[in-house]
Design a protein with these regions (language model features):
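Metal-dependent enolase-superfamily TIM-barrel catalytic cores that perform enediolate-based chemistry
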Residues: 118-229
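Hydrophobic faces of well-ordered beta-strands that scaffold small-molecule active sites
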Residues: 42-44, 128-134, 155-159, 182-186, ...
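Predominant activation on well-ordered alpha-helical scaffold segments within soluble catalytic domains
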Residues: 60, 64-67, 101, 105-106, ...
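Conserved, mostly hydrophobic/aromatic
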Residues: 32, 39, 100, 113, ...
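Flexible C-terminal active-site loop/helix
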Residues: 4, 8-12, 27-29, 37, ...
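Metal- or metallocofactor-binding catalytic centers and their adjacent structured scaffolds
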Residues: 6-8, 22, 35-37, 41-111, ...
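Haloarchaeal acidic low-complexity proteome signature biased toward cell-envelope/secretome components but also
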Residues: 1-19, 23-26, 65-66, 72-73, ...
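Catalytic alpha/beta core domains of metabolic enzymes, predominantly
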Residues: 217-308
Length: 349
């Protein structure tokens, strides 16, 4: 017997977050709880992205149908059957599916009395550091934000680009954080030829890689950039679900996988292994999301080359505790000490 419920939570972002497509001041997440009637509750959350056709309203509209599948199967360990039945009822809406999958995974791990990463046998010492994202702003503000992030101990910064002053921004950020490992994300803002010019200039500032230089709608452009770029190329908007992995294997060096794009931990794990099989490096990213969602991604961190799991760090405050994340890394082994299995618990509970 499983009981389910969900609620919408409005999470103010500490500093309005801007990328080449627009600005966001609040993150609307949907938190799902699944209880087994004997005191264990699994928690998960959806962070819907309008870019992938979802909103808080679309998640709210489909969650009752997805959760009725969970209740009718009634077993948190029957994730394969529940996933198949969920997809039969609602084919798309990946963030809504992810929230349910995370909450079920959390409940299954809690019933077994281990954190998720230990259920999978993963090595907590193999987690890469997460990057901290510097959103678009005036060049001076981006310089200040980069200096503040470096002061706070973040050694890896991901800089949003896609403006008419990209080279000025990267010079200012490099100046403010001379020792940081820099990555950049254009969110598809460049044309292929512009991307080559930009990436040539970025290479002079010791940038590690470039994410989504051209729009996902231009796969030939992505290959054109990949074949000419002096820096590795990561595919994010071009790499959404499992079939995209082989499709980007000759167009990118790195697959950026997100639970909210692919529909949860099960699909994300399949994408990670598919990416490895196609010779891609693996990055796990996030939306702006509460720990009730992002903690799940953190449990996969030992499988990654690159982590971009700073969504909760960008919030003014997060009502959910999760995996401790800071400039030193993603601290999975801290969960054993706290006895916190699975994903987030409310801080005030
Ligand atoms: Mg991206």
């Amino acid at each position: 017997m499983l009981d389910t419920e969900f609620e919408r939570v409005s999470l103010p972002i500490s500093d309005a977050f801007t990328i080449s497509r627009g600005t966001q001041e609040t993150a609307e997440n949907l938190v799902v709880r699944i209880s087994d009637g004997s005191g264990a509750t699994g928690v998960g959350a959806a962070a819907p992205s309008p870019h992938y056709g979802e909103s808080a309203a679309t998640v709210e509209a489909v969650l009752p149908a997805l959760l009725s599948v969970v209740e009718s199967v009634g077993d948190p360990h029957a994730r394969q059957r529940i996933e198949r039945d969920r997809k039969d009822v609602i084919a798309d809406n990946p963030a809504a599916h992810a929230a349910v999958d995370i909450a079920l995974s959390d409940l299954a791990a809690k019933r077994l009395g281990v954190p998720l990463y230990r259920k999978w046998g993963l090595d907590p010492d193999a987690t890469p550091m997460t990057s901290f994202t510097i959103g678009l702003d005036s060049t001076d503000r981006m310089r200040e934000k980069a200096a503040a992030a470096a002061d706070a101990g973040h050694e890896v910064l991901k800089v949003k680009l896609g403006t008419d002053r990209d080279s000025e921004i990267i010079a200012a950020v490099r100046d403010a954080a001379p020792d940081a490992r820099l990555r950049v994300d254009a969110n598809g803002a460049w044309t292929p030829n512009e991307a080559i010019r930009q990436i040539d200039a970025l290479a002079d500032h010791d940038v590690a890689f470039v994410e989504q230089p051209v729009p996902a709608a231009d796969p030939d452009g992505l290959r054109y950039v990949y074949e000419r770029s002096p820096l590795p190329v990561a595919a994010d908007e071009s790499c959404v679900t499992l079939p995209d992995v082989p499709a980007v294997a000759d167009r990118a060096d790195i697959a950026n996988i997100k639970l909210m794009k692919c529909g949860g931990l099960g699909p994300a794990r399949r994408m990670i292994h598919a990416a490895r099989a196609h010779g891609l490096e693996v990055m796990l990213g996030c939306m702006i999301e509460t720990n009730a969602a992002i903690a799940a991604a953190c449990h996969l961190a030992p499988l990654l080359d690159y982590a971009d799991l700073d969504g909760s760090l960008l919030l003014e405050s997060d009502p959910y505790a999760g995996v401790p994340v800071d400039g030193d890394g993603i601290h999975l082994s801290a969960l054993d000490d706290r006895g916190l299995a699975g994903t987030g618990a409310r801080r005030d509970e």
